[in-house]
Structure formats: structure tokens, C-alpha cells
Amino acid sequence: MVLAEDLECLKALALMGGMREPVFISSQTLGEVLETSPQTASRRLKALEGQRLISRTLNPDGQHITVTKEGEDGLRREYAEYCRLFAHEGGHYTLPGIVISGLGEGRYYMSLEPYKKQFLRHLGFEPYPGTLNLRLSGSDIPTRKKIDSLTWIPIHGFSAEGRTFGEVRCMPCRINDIPCGIVVPGRSHYPEDIVEVIAPVGLRDALGVKENDRVNVEVAYD
């Protein structure tokens, strides 16, 4: 886990352009940016480097620093958490569903690297290989349609292994404070009473649910 003060330092380096290219900075200057001593700034850099969140090349009068992919992913997770936090100011829809078995295809699709990278970038987590499948009652279809009218995140398709994998839509959501995402294949005629949910953990185990148990999915809106 990244400490708050180290995350502050990482954010400052990213704002200087460290995610695009190496930035040259001394511990003295970084300390001034962070309103702390050069020694403390140096310790934070060592901590970030130790966690592989930055890479750096030392020079006599400073250092070239680059925010690594791991560092960028850490910032994206932080951003996603703030988005979920403040999105609740608008309100939320609650979508109750009954746990059902799927076809097992979710495990395969969630293991594909191009999908995993996009979910990490947009949702702030790498999905557990598999989906939680829920069936809605007829009375909850209107709520599902309201959620469908919100702005969804497109997950782009790609070609691999001699196959073409289509676009997927996803919607950030939560189940019992676990960050999740509703996923809908791009193909038309997807059943409106079925909801597939991804998460960073296996939801059946994390929630302690089994077939025919009831689960509430919460979707925030502005």
C-alpha cells in the first residue's frame, strides 16, 4: 500500500510530466514543491523507487525521474476511488438480482490481457477471472433501463489468437463496498434481465453468496 505522503510525491512528479517523459529535478526543488525538507523529499523518492512506482537516474546536481506503469496504475486507482466517492453526491440506483450460473465464458474473457489493461485503466482494478451473473425480476427492468441511459465506458475490441474480440461496455458500481463493474457485450439483443458483474475479487467467495441468493448492485449517477 502506498503511504499518503508518498502518493502526494508521486502525484507531484506526474503533474510535472513524469508520466510522459523523464523529468529533471533536485531534492531541494522537490522539497519546495512538497513544502518539506530536501531530506524528506529524498526519502520519499527512495520509497517510491523501492516500490517500483518511479525509476530514476542520479546526477551530481539532481536526477531524472520517470513515473513507471506501476506508478501510473496507482494514480489511476486513486482517481477511480475519488470518482466513486464524489459520484454519490448525485444519487444511486439499486439493482437487486438473484445469483445464477453463467456459461463460464467470463473466466476466459477476463483473462485476456487487452481487456484486463482497459478495465484497470478505467475502473482502477484488474478483474478477477470470471463474472458474477445475476437475474433481475421484471419489476427491476425499468431501473436497468435507467442505468442503460447513463454514460458507459467503452472497452475496445481487438484481434488476437486469430480471433476478433468485440467491444464491451462497462459501468462502475459497488456491491457491499466492493468496487465492481457491470459489463455488457457489444452485441445486440443481450438479455435485459441478466447482469454480469466483474470485480478485483471472486464475488461469490467475497460476499459469501451461492446460487439463488439475492445481491444488491449500486450504481452512482450525477
UniProtKB/Swiss-Prot annotation:
InterPro entries hit by this protein: RibK_CTP-dep (IPR039063), Riboflavin_kinase_archaeal (IPR023470), Riboflavin_kinase_CTP-dep (IPR023602), Riboflavin_kinase_dom_sf (IPR023465), WH-like_DNA-bd_sf (IPR036388), WH_DNA-bd_sf (IPR036390)
Residues bound to CDP: G102, L103, G104, E105, G106, R107, V201, G202, L203, R204
Q: Which cofactor does it need?
A: Mg(2+)
GO biological process assignments:
FMN biosynthetic process; riboflavin biosynthetic process
Under Gene Ontology molecular function, one entry of this record is: riboflavin kinase activity
Q: Answer yes or no on keyword Protein biosynthesis.
A: no
- Which residues participate in Mg(2+) binding? T131, N133
Enzyme Commission number, as recorded: 2.7.1.161
Assigned keywords, A-Z: Flavoprotein, FMN, Kinase, Magnesium, Metal-binding, Nucleotide-binding, Transferase
One Pfam family, short name please?
A: CTP-dep_RFKase
Q: What does the note accompanying the cofactor annotation read? A: Binds 1 Mg(2+) ion per subunit.
Q: In which pathway does this enzyme or protein participate? A: Cofactor biosynthesis; FMN biosynthesis; FMN from riboflavin (CTP route): step 1/1
The reactions it catalyses are: riboflavin + CTP = CDP + FMN + H(+)
Keyword Flavoprotein annotated: yes
| Functional note | Catalyzes the CTP-dependent phosphorylation of riboflavin (vitamin B2) to form flavin mononucleotide (FMN).
State the family named in the UniProt similarity comment for this chain: Belongs to the archaeal riboflavin kinase family.
Official protein name in the record:
Riboflavin kinase
Species per Swiss-Prot/TrEMBL record: Methanoregula boonei (strain DSM 21154 / JCM 14090 / 6A8)
State the gene name recorded for this protein: ribK
